[in-house]
Regions:
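Short acidic-hydrophobic, aromatic-tinged amphipathic segments that line or gate anion-handling sites
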Residues: 56-59, 319-326, 395-407
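Active-site and donor-binding regions of nucleotide-sugar-utilizing enzymes
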Residues: 4-182, 350
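Well-ordered, non-membrane alpha-helical segments in soluble/globular domains
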Residues: 14-18, 101-114, 134-142, 265-291, ...
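Donor nucleotide-activated moiety binding/catalytic core segment of transferases
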Residues: 304-351, 355-356
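Catalytic binding pocket for nucleotide-activated donors in carbohydrate/polymer assembly enzymes
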Residues: 350-413, 417
Length: 426
């Protein structure tokens, strides 16, 4: 029997590597993930070459280039494969969905695996995952079916949302939970202490692990940053804005006639809500970039954000962080930071700087803007519980403004401190 890691994000893949090379180094394992961003096919190949996992399964979760995409690209004036190809794709997808209803979970999964071959669902006695998509539920359901319910189903840290009580409402029974900072989970004191296990923190002196994750995620020094006296990349006197991947309103929705607006009513409503988050996020970025006091502003693009976001960011003075498509945690393991300010809506990447590393690091001031961006459009109760707990643990460096004016005031004070520190270091 062996472990199976079902990963929806690169951060979960990083955590699977960490667990498999520490707690489970004497146990066989497979890894399953999806084509939800560009480059995941190459990522799967690099994972396979490490030999850490017996099998790497890659599930085709890419957007269907069917009739909907054909209409969208035609309205936007973009190239496409033509109506006939789009029709065939849509028909094939309809057949797949219909057959899946009759053939069950095993077919639904295996029919779209593009690397690794067919899964042996009976091979596992432990699964590590998070119940966030129907695909995960299907996979776990089939495993429980073929193991007569004997397989342990564990939840694996996937960022801040894993610390919310809502993750306990799953479509399958939970055995254990693996987290970096269990005490920050808002359900920790509700009878879960004995079932939450700490993921080993990443040791900055562990060069073997760094070599593994650098290879897997294809981390390279592109020459943008200097090194410190210990041989680490060094980011000094920087303001970093962490992107999150809400999409702006697609161009084709801005030019629809009344008939098409009626036909596409539901997707229009969805895009309208998401684009509101995008616009507020960009408003916060403009404040960050336009009031930097002459300091360098860097944007860390979300791994799943399209490169088309770059042009919008660069309307303000900024540079884009290198290695855009790798987890920030990999970059942090290769880098030291001095006199930084980090700003985001609610990105996990800031929290992991303080949560997942074993060594003591500079206490970087961090500003979380979710109360401003989500206000009126999204409930943020569980975000708030987590980030308030995070703030209580790091009261001198975590800031959660409630208004744009408060953000501007906090930011101005931090810029003054940054400039004073730079002068003192000269």
């Amino acid at each position: 029997m062996k472990n199976l890691y079902i990963c929806l994000t690169d951060f979960q893949i990083l955590n699977a590597l960490n667990l498999q090379l520490s707690k489970f180094k004497n146990k066989k394992a497979d890894l399953f993930f999806i084509t939800n961003k560009e480059g995941n096919e190459q990522l799967a190949e690099r994972l396979a070459t490490t030999g850490i996992f017996e099998k790497i399964y890659l599930f085709n979760n890419s957007r269907i280039q069917g009739l909907h995409q054909y209409v969208r690209s035609t309205v936007e004036g973009k190239t496409n494969k033509g109506f006939a190809a789009a029709l065939v794709t849509s028909v094939n997808e309809a057949v797949y969905k219909l057959r899946s209803k009759f053939s069950g979970e095993a077919y639904r999964i295996n029919a779209k695996i593009v690397l690794g071959g067919k899964m042996d669902f009976a091979a596992y006695d432990e699964v590590f995952c998070l119940d966030k998509r129907s695909l995960v539920v299907d996979c776990v359901t089939q495993i429980l079916k073929e193991t007569s319910g004997k397989c342990k189903i564990n939840l694996l840290d996937e960022g801040t949302s894993t610390y919310w009580r809502s993750i306990l409402k799953t479509n399958f029974p939970i055995s254990d939970i693996y987290l970096y900072a269990p005490e920050l989970a808002n359900y920790y004191a509700e009878g879960w202490q004995e079932r939450i296990y700490k993921i080993p923190k990443i040791d900055y002196s562990d060069e073997k692990f760094r070599a593994v994750i650098n290879k897997v995620f294809d981390f390279k020094d592109d020459g943008n940053y200097p090194y410190d006296d210990k041989g680490s990349l060094f980011l000094k006197d920087k303001i970093i804005f962490f992107d999150q991947n809400w999409d702006p309103m697609p161009e084709y929705f801005k030019h629809l006639n009344k008939f098409m607006m009626l036909l596409l009513h539901n997707p229009y409503k969805k895009h309208k809500k998401e684009s509101a988050f995008y616009e507020r996020k960009m408003q916060m970025f403009r404040i960050t970039a336009d009031n930097s006091g002459g300091n360098d502003v860097i944007v860390k693009l979300h791994p799943r954000s399209p490169l088309s976001f770059v042009a919008d960011y660069q309307k303000s003075k900024c540079t884009m962080a290198p290695n855009l498509k790798i987890p920030w945690e990999v970059f942090m393991d290769n880098c030291r930071f001095n006199n930084n300010i980090w700003v985001t809506v609610s990105s996990t990447a800031l929290c992991t700087y303080k949560m997942i590393f074993a060594d003591s690091r500079e206490d970087i001031p961090m500003i979380f803007l979710y109360k401003i961006v989500y206000d009126g459009n999204k409930s943020y109760q569980e975000d708030d519980q987590f980030f308030k707990g995070f703030q209580q643990k790091y009261p001198q460096s975590v800031f959660i403004p409630e208004t744009t004016e408060e953000f501007a005031q906090i930011y101005k004070k931090l810029i003054t401190k940054m400039n004073d520190k730079r002068k003192d270091n000269k």
